[in-house]
Amino acid sequence: MGVFDPIKGFGVTFSTMFRKVVTEEYPEVKKIPAPRFHGKHQLNRHPDGLEKCVGCELCAWACPADAIFVEGGTNTEDERYSPGERYGMDYQINYLRCIGCGLCIEACPTRSLTMTNEYETADDNRRDLIFTKEDLLAPLLPGMEQPPHPMRLGNDEQDYYVRGPELARQAGVPEGETVETGPEEARR
């Protein structure tokens, strides 16, 4: 050990004292993640409020961690939850098992399932980390109606999937805001 070693150590301490603080005040000031960040899942809706999920279970089959459970149900004219023949009657994502890989997003044929930038999913109760359909559904925007209700944007499911963006503009979804993002992400 050299004579000047303590002085070198104090030099590091003194130089650090005059630098800008890099500490983040986490719960009070939340960092906005990058747009490509894989956060909490969200089940999206059509512009009239019907669900995009058709209960095909492709997301559950694509999940390598077996974290997704989907049970499909059949739509009727009296109770219609999605434009197709089926809808996701029971939908669950187990965040104790989810690894955030995004393979479920790629597998979804209707772009019903997307990932938001929400990263706070920690909880002290294991049961609360199994998110149900009600927890994952996108909130209703102005002009949307709570399902079940008849198809408002067309006569068949092709009107929803082929002419979707045109129908969204006619339904009054503001420019720059999509049904997937909602008003909070359109402002960024």
Curated annotation (Swiss-Prot):
Leader sequence segment: none
Residues involved in [4Fe-4S] cluster 2 binding: C63, C98, C101, C104
Top-rank EC class of the record's enzyme: translocase
Primary location group: membrane
Residue numbers spanned by region Disordered: 166-188
Keyword Cytoplasm in annotation: no
UniProt keyword Transmembrane, yes or no: no
Co-factor(s): [4Fe-4S] cluster
Alphabetic keyword roster: 4Fe-4S, Cell membrane, Iron, Iron-sulfur, Membrane, Metal-binding, NAD, Quinone, Repeat, Translocase, Ubiquinone
Membrane topology classification: Peripheral membrane protein
Biased composition (Low complexity): 172-181
PROSITE patterns assigned: 4FE4S_FER_1, 4FE4S_FER_2
Cellular location(s): Cell membrane
The enzyme's E.C. designation: 7.1.1.-
Positions contributing to [4Fe-4S] cluster 1 binding: C53, C56, C59, C108
Residue span(s) of domain 4Fe-4S ferredoxin-type: 43-73, 89-118
Gene Ontology cellular-component terms listed: plasma membrane
GO terms (BP aspect): aerobic respiration
Taxonomic superkingdom: Bacteria
Pfam families in UniProt: Fer4_7 (PF12838)
InterPro entries noted in UniProt: 4Fe4S_Fe-S-bd (IPR017896), 4Fe4S_Fe_S_CS (IPR017900), NADH_quinone_OxRdtase_chainI (IPR010226)
Quaternary structure, from the entry: NDH-1 is composed of 14 different subunits. Subunits NuoA, H, J, K, L, M, N constitute the membrane sector of the complex.
Function according to Swiss-Prot or TrEMBL: NDH-1 shuttles electrons from NADH, via FMN and iron-sulfur (Fe-S) centers, to quinones in the respiratory chain. The immediate electron acceptor for the enzyme in this species is believed to be ubiquinone. Couples the redox reaction to proton translocation (for every two electrons transferred, four hydrogen ions are translocated across the cytoplasmic membrane), and thus conserves the redox energy in a proton gradient.
Similarity-based family: Belongs to the complex I 23 kDa subunit family.
Protein name: NADH-quinone oxidoreductase subunit I
Organism: Saccharopolyspora erythraea (strain ATCC 11635 / DSM 40517 / JCM 4748 / NBRC 13426 / NCIMB 8594 / NRRL 2338)
Protein encoded by which gene: nuoI
